[in-house]
Amino acid sequence: MPPLQLLRSLSALPDINPVVDFPAPNPAPKSTVAGDAFPSVYSTLAPHALTNLVFKHYDIEVPKGCRFWHRGLSDVYLVETLADDYILRISHQHWRTESEIQFELELLNFLADRDVPVAAPLRHRDGGYALEINAPEGKRYASLFPYAPGGVAIGDLSKTQGFLLGEMLAQLHQTAQRFKPSAHRPPLTLSYLLDDSLHTIAPFLHHRLEEWRCLIDISMAIKTQLTSIPTHTPYWTICWGDPHSGNVHFTAEDQMMLFDFDQCGMGWRAFDIAKFLQVSMQSGLGRNIRDAFLSGYNSIAPLTVLEENSLQALTQTAFIWSWAIHVQTLKLSDYSRLHGSYFKRRLENLQQLGSTDWQLF
């Protein structure tokens, strides 16, 4: 829905606090008496059971341990064997469809086959790359990856690493122009990045109309500025979706391995750069390193003047998209943080990104 229609529809929202609109579990229990399965929306799978699953379906050494490593947009487990370590990623039923997951895995295999250093999924014994799990809340999907050598840059990226990462992103974009997926996932259009995000945020600004109107005005200005960017190559290609220093490992020799393509999709290559800038500024990465990243990218695939002039609006777009994803996550895991000051602070950060000194923040 366009922003103006969203604004008009805001007055029609019920005068209640926003609630989490979860799909019913499949199949939904008919009752919740003792002995029946209670409905679930966000289960935690037992590491010992996942150890057995991995050993049964993958040609790896006997696991000596499995640890719940991180909960984010997927649940991540570290699987350890005597010889090697692996990352087991379990999708969330409410976040990704089977088709969206297959798209990502196809992309990773495509890039790895063309010498782009990505952590590609391992094939299981049945020939596929994802295992279906019947979790209490519905179907989830497990994929196993080799543990990326090296580690996250200590104290964040150096200038050299920033330059190298920019170079690699440009090479990824060029290589991915030939990617022909069999699976579908939504492209990173302004409708997906902005309009859908506003739908997520809108109910929480029901009683904060001034802030809502400000958000609408910013979104409309972004759309006006970005309407002239073409949607064909080289401007439009496969995007990583979340390029930043936390999603790449560097060895001591500055060899890199990229991972976490959960937010990938067809989009503007300049959006990937803007996403790097948005995350980097939010985490406090120095301007000199951000500039080195841009220099690295331009050394392989120079941006046009139109794209360079669009980076600020695209960085704001990336911020709004990330904001909406964060809201969706908090609705599941920490609703107490979704209070007025949270939205006030986020809007202030967004306004800073729209200032003439936006690169200073």
Curated annotation (Swiss-Prot):
Belongs to the pseudomonas-type ThrB family. This is Uncharacterized protein sll1119. PANTHER family: AMINOGLYCOSIDE PHOSPHOTRANSFERASE DOMAIN-CONTAINING PROTEIN (PTHR21064:SF6), AMINOGLYCOSIDE PHOSPHOTRANSFERASE DOMAIN-CONTAINING PROTEIN-RELATED (PTHR21064). It comes from Synechocystis sp. (strain ATCC 27184 / PCC 6803 / Kazusa). InterPro entries: Aminoglycoside_PTrfase (IPR002575), Kinase-like_dom_sf (IPR011009), Pseudomonas-type_ThrB (IPR050249). GO terms for molecular function: homoserine kinase activity. Pfam families: APH (PF01636). GO terms for biological process: threonine biosynthetic process. SUPFAM superfamilies: Protein kinase-like (PK-like).
